């Protein structure tokens, strides 16, 4: 039943991403009891991280999980529970911060591009209290939060220059 649910969530996120472009769902923890190769587990607990830049899409994905759980209860005769242990709404970065980062990049002839982060960051918490922005150095192959992630030293140095200039301009109201 768990494998069906996880695959259903993956498919729902992929379908949503094809139309909206930013939905992501990840199952990062899985606990099976008993954990034996030849025993059907009596209890499975797992965590799912569902993200999108639009809260409506997140809500739709959660609703699809609820519907699949109900379907699995009926078809498989299992009991399920759904518990939301951590919920932070998507946060847009402040235009003043984004403009400062773009301006700093321009001043060093370093290309900057607006992207949506697929991962949760501290800025999601801070955005409720003040203006926030994020700066990412490019990772080879676009890999992020993965063992394949690698950023060249020169890209890290360039990002540091851009960040320093942007913070200076914001701190001195010189943007």
List where the protein language model places each region:
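A short beta-alpha structural unit
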Residues: 26-35, 46-53, 79-98, 124
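Zn-dependent metallopeptidase/amidohydrolase metal-coordination segment
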Residues: 112-161
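Flexible, glycine/charged-enriched surface loops at secondary-structure junctions
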Residues: 11-27, 72-83, 111-116, 172-175
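Midchain, well-structured core segments that form catalytic/ion-binding scaffolds
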Residues: 1-56
């Amino acid at each position: 039943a768990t494998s069906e649910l996880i695959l259903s969530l993956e498919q729902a996120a992929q379908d949503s991403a094809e139309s909206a472009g930013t939905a992501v769902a990840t199952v990062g923890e899985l606990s099976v009891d008993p954990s034996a190769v030849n025993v059907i587990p009596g209890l499975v607990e797992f965590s799912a991280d569902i993200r999108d830049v639009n809260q409506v899409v997140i809500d739709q994905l959660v609703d699809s999980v609820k519907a699949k759980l109900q379907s699995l209860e009926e078809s498989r005769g299992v009991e399920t529970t759904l518990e939301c242990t951590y919920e932070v709404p998507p946060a847009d970065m402040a235009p003043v911060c984004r403009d400062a980062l773009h301006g700093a990049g321009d001043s060093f002839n370093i290309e900057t591009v607006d992207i949506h982060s697929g991962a949760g960051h501290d800025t999601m918490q801070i955005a409720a209290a003040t203006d926030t922005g994020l700066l990412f150095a490019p990772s080879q192959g676009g890999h992020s939060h993965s063992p394949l992630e690698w950023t060249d030293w020169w890209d890290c140095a360039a990002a540091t220059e851009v960040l320093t200039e942007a913070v200076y301009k914001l701190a001195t109201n010189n943007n």
